[in-house]
Amino acid sequence: MNKKLTDYVIDLAEILNKQQKQVFWGIFDIFSMVVSIIVSYILFYGLINPAPVDYIIYTSLAFLFYQLMIGFWGLNASISRYSKITDFMKIFFGVTASSVLSYSICYAFLPLFSIRFIILFILLSTFLILLPRITWQLIYSRRKKGSGDGEHRRTFLIGAGDGGALFMDSYQHPTSELELVGILDKDSKKKGQKLGGIPVLGSYDNLPELAKRHQIERVIVAIPSLDPSEYERILQMCNKLGVKCYKMPKVETVVQGLHQAGTGFQKIDITDLLGRQEIRLDESRLGAELTGKTILVTGAGGSIGSEICRQVSRFNPERIVLLGHGENSIYLVYHELIRKFQGIDYVPVIADIQDYDRLLQVFEQYKPAIVYHAAAHKHVPMMERNPKEAFKNNIRGTYNVAKAVDEAKVSKMVMISTDKAVNPPNVMGATKRVAELIVTGFNQRSQSTYCAVRFGNVLGSRGSVIPVFERQIAEGGPVTVTDFRMTRYFMTIPEASRLVIHAGAYAKDGEVFILDMGKPVKIYDLAKKMVLLSGHTESEIPIVEVGIRPGEKLYEELLVSTELVDNQVMDKIFVGKVNVMPLESINQKIGEFRILSGDELKQAIIAFANQTTHIE
């Protein structure tokens, strides 16, 4: 078969989803039966007489019974490239049984049919119905043989529920590289059932025994709500077996067709083992906040800034101004966004938030309705060594953004803060606490609305410990932890960004919103999970304690005892009672900081930040 034709057929199959394929095969099957009865009639009676109504009734009944039987056998009128000879036999018996049943009904009232006519109809219908299905398997076999990739690995699917059914739709893609041997489920009672023609072999508690028996090379977890401890247990079993373990993509990703066609699985990552639940967006509120507006994001090339741009883009703003100091990161984010989202005017702007005149010029030119201020220096040890840079970027830079918001009459400013701003022993946290004061101070005197959003560590960000652990594991270890007792709050980048956008939508009067980070996680436990994810053991990749670095705390806090939570505006977003200082007093302090440097500057900022945590 011509290779171009083969590729065209496979490309065509990629366009259709499961429901569309079922409709296609249903239409094709009734067409095949109509053609079969016309040809049979012509062969028996010629073209002299028009076909009586009896034959139309017979064809309709035959197709109806055929569809019922195929549906009963779970074939849904569609055959995939994994179909066995038994599936083809079911189609043959379905055509035969439906034809005989229809003949019996018609014969009881309209005895016009010949047995030879029915036999010819059955043979023709079966041939026409099976021909494209068998051709499809031959096309795929030819494609697979030509690829020679050797990736057709024996696989177990874990999950016989809705997640497993959704995965099966992706799995039956023509470019899939899986050889699905069986399905395991938490519920052992499902043993003996079938999902998409694949048998449920039992509980995944028996994974070690079943994997050895069936020579399994890969396991894919398709239970979206699986508890993190169960993920960890499955991973441990797979590691002992030397079997690769994966997961299906997120449900919305599969439903929207955003995953890579034909793969249908992803690597299990640390977020699966930490069990962070996805945040549901208040679509109507955020739509009113963002749709048709001009949005400006500072630090748009960073982890949080770029994700805010992605999340905001879902609500179809008119324009997003991507403001950042690093040209490479802004370039990458800009091209990603214009590729993923249409109808939005993305404007890449290279600017330094320490340059007030440049900021004001950008704000007045594009007239944003909302500014998300994500630009900041955030590495604690680096800022301990460079306190002047922390002051210039996190304090003066925030002041410049807030002032430009006021001057350009921007409706709202949302600043990204951190849990390190609470009782800060380090210059980075202290500068972010002063930045909070700047935002609340401007809110007192400006017609614009200001707020800050405080949260903890973000998994996978450029400043996160995760990339450090990944690099250390890739190098063979050891994985270094400053103190085995150290804990941190963690949140995923999309979750943090969604909550920031939500908090901004609730901003009214200079609030400092505090995100519910869940329970703190021991860094040592995080390191152990990372080693497990890599497929190694602690004996292979040791974890060592190296001591706390300057400016670090054993335990982070989201608020101090005096910052009692005032109220909860929505799930996982609280409003803290934080101290507010007149902008004039803040200006005076900033003036004092300007003339200091080194340790003097560091001590002055830390002392001032800690003084401001008490409610007056």
Which residues does each PLM region occupy?
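Signature of alpha-helical transmembrane segments in polytopic membrane proteins
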Residues: 1-150, 240, 247, 371
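Strand-loop microenvironment adjacent to phosphate/nucleotide-handling motifs in alpha/beta enzyme folds
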Residues: 21, 280, 285-289, 441-458, ...
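A solvent-exposed beta-alpha-beta segment
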Residues: 45-49, 139-255, 328-332, 339, ...
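Hydrophobic/aromatic anchor residues within beta-strands of the central parallel beta-sheet
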Residues: 348, 390, 450-453
